Every structure is written in C-alpha cells, then in structure tokens.
C-alpha cells in the first residue's frame, strides 16, 4: 500500500478518567479511511498495561464500564507499554498516511489529543495539527436539525475499535443527510 496524503487516521483511546495529569491511557485503536470514509486499514487494538494502583483509582463510571467490557482484565493481563503501543501504531500508520498529513479524526478527539500529548507525544506528532471531530458536527446538527439526530443511534460500548467504527459510520450518516455530498 502506498501512503496517501488524502487518507484519514481515526483514533480512539480509552482512559482511566478525563484528566491527563492524573489518569492514564488503557486502550488504543486506529483505523485508516480513504477520503470517501471507506475503511482501508485496521491498526492494532492494544490494551496498555497499567498498575493495580492506577486501575483502583478509577472513578465508579470507569470501573463499571471498563469492567463490564472486559477492558480492565485485558489491561491487567497485557504486557504492552505506552511506548510499545506508540511504535506499533506508527508502524501501521506509515503504510497508509505520511507523517503530518492527516488530521486526527474521531469523536471528542480533543480529549484524545490531550492524552496523546501527555503520554504518547511521538504519536501525537504524527498527526496534522487539525482535527476532524465528529462530535462537533453532532452538536451542530442537534441544534440546527434535531430531527436528523433520530436517524443515527450509537452503541456507546466504550471499546476503542467499536467506538472508531461508530464515529466513521456517524460521519457517513451526517455526510449523506446533512451535507448531502
């Protein structure tokens, strides 16, 4: 596969909480689409090992959701470090998109970028500084065309790969219903 500057990198992180100064990344997944939002590559889905102390410090919401999804058990069993996850993810991305070409794509991607900046700077640097944040479009559609919102329902599994797949599907929906292109 030849790397293409028009391809888009989609990323999702699962974290122990919302504060990068305190919380940690526990899962990362990436997908690459072409410019028409067709998935052309799936990167590694990596549970990142964190200590029992880090996991025990999670609030009730994170304990519940990451426990029910099996992610906490996967994190405990994982031997993967943040540095290893970065190296594997970049090795995947290099096949599809040159460094600095793709905006960071996903839902509420500003939060992911904050954690990448703190714990995975080399990966954060792989992206263009711009974002394609599907949640921005969702917020506008909710205000400008609320009836359109009923046509797309997310599963909200809080599992990184499924969340990215839903983000892409959501943008495809908005493209066809709102942008009509």
From Swiss-Prot:
Active site, UniProt feature: 129
EC top class, as a word: hydrolase
Keywords: Cytoplasm, Exonuclease, Hydrolase, Nuclease
Disulfide topology: none
Top-level taxon in the UniProt lineage: Bacteria
UniProt cross-references to InterPro entries, sorted A to Z: Exonuclease_RNaseT/DNA_pol3, Oligoribonuclease, RNaseH-like_sf, RNaseH_sf
GO molecular function: 3'-5'-RNA exonuclease activity; nucleic acid binding
Cytoplasm keyword on record: yes
Known EC number: 3.1.15.-
Domain Exonuclease: residue ranges: 8-171
Subcellular location: Cytoplasm
Keyword Nuclease found: yes
GO biological process: DNA metabolic process
Function: 3'-to-5' exoribonuclease specific for small oligoribonucleotides.
Family according to the record: Belongs to the oligoribonuclease family.
The protein's name in its UniProt record: Oligoribonuclease
Gene that produces this protein: orn
